[in-house]
Amino acid sequence: MADHDPHVRQRVVLLIDGLGWHQLRDRTAIAPTLAGLAGTVITSVAPTTTATALTSLTTGMCPGEHGLVGYRMDMGSSVMNTLRWGDERGDLRRTHAPADVQPCVPFMGVKVPVVSKAELEDTGFTEAHLRGSTPRGWRVASSIPVIIEQLLAAGEPIVYAYYDGLDKVSHERGFGPHYDAELRACDRLVADIMASLPDGVALYVTADHGQVQVGGNILQQPTEVMACVARQSGEGRFRWLHARRGAERDLVSACIEVHSDVAWVVTRDQILEEQWFGPVVRPAALRRLGDVALVARDDVTFDDPADGGHFVLQCRHGSMTPAEVEVPLLVHVAQR
């Protein structure tokens, strides 16, 4: 890979949110630039969700260490949406300081320039996984290659760029013409970045997760399960159920009886034993986990009435199926 190429002087990491290996492999004809790059398939983290995976990328730590163990986390007093860094009452930065919730230093303390949406700069999640970096916000995607080119010309050894268009389209529209059009746009974006790179710069393209089309396959929890549940966290395809006091065993039995045909029903102890979140799980991170995880195996999602939105998500992620967990790591080294 380019890390061992003595020709490489600078590096750019571009993360395309939601660009799964399987989705790209099935659409190489509409993404010729991406399809033509050298590279391989790598695996994301558990759960395959943006907050968890991006934080592992920027800190180099497994979820059990950095502590952002899901999209919605049980923080004791409430369940916090990690991307919004809030709950139904609003922003939680005063009570849950990002640097306390996620204590690992991003980028090993190096002040890396981050090329991401300008509107994301002043958020709790940005503070949690990008603090100490230098924000270089963009308002339209066409600015991304321009900003990267300027940073490289200024001598920056590493540039990190993030683009979320593909993830947004797949959530709202699913796989189809809108997704394909956005994948073409991503391919053009990568081509434009490659064209702007000076000699000796390596470009790495990767992702946080893939997607599966779920649509209206939304499963409600039956009475025998909810009778054992105090609250829920996580997300639809990696749903944590937190048991009522004394109901832990009954919850496991009920979930196996009802959901084992479409999901992996996994206890917290099993997840720890099998190191789903890495070999080390800090006590604070452990407290954020539920008692039982419903990890979708089929193309379904598990509903939580407290985790709603403005529209039904067509594509989802979070589980550990190949379509969600396998992502590309593609490399291009500019040689002029």
Briefly describe each language-model feature range.
Residues M1-R336:
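Feature captures the catalytic ectodomains and active-site-proximal regions of enzymes
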